[in-house]
Amino acid sequence: MSANKVLKLIKDKEIEYVDLRFTDPRGKLQHLTMDVTVVDEGMLNEGVFFDGSSIAGWKAINESDMILKPDTARMFMDPFTSHNTVVLFCDILDAVKKSPYERDPRGVAKKAEEYLKLSLIHI
């Protein structure tokens, strides 16, 4: 789904919050909830900076800038919140290189899936 379609859904469904979710190296689901007023096309396409040193096993404080990059194809309305909230799963990017962070479990899974597709191993 494109960023424009996500923004249209946010408007049409009167969404109040956007919950950006990702998994830490230990497999625990983490999230960052944002008021919908700060969500725009740039944020959906480029991501949001966050402090990676707050996640165990990721970055030291002096190199902690990371990016949560929403995957607009992985979105759903959270049925358990009292306010209209949309959830977007995110990839983690290195803020300096703008490339996938090598310790992001989601990124590791994507690399493994790609490797399996290119190898003789078929699942």
Task: Cite the ranges covered by each PLM segment.
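ATP/Mg2+-dependent ligation/transfer catalytic cores
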Residues: M1-I121
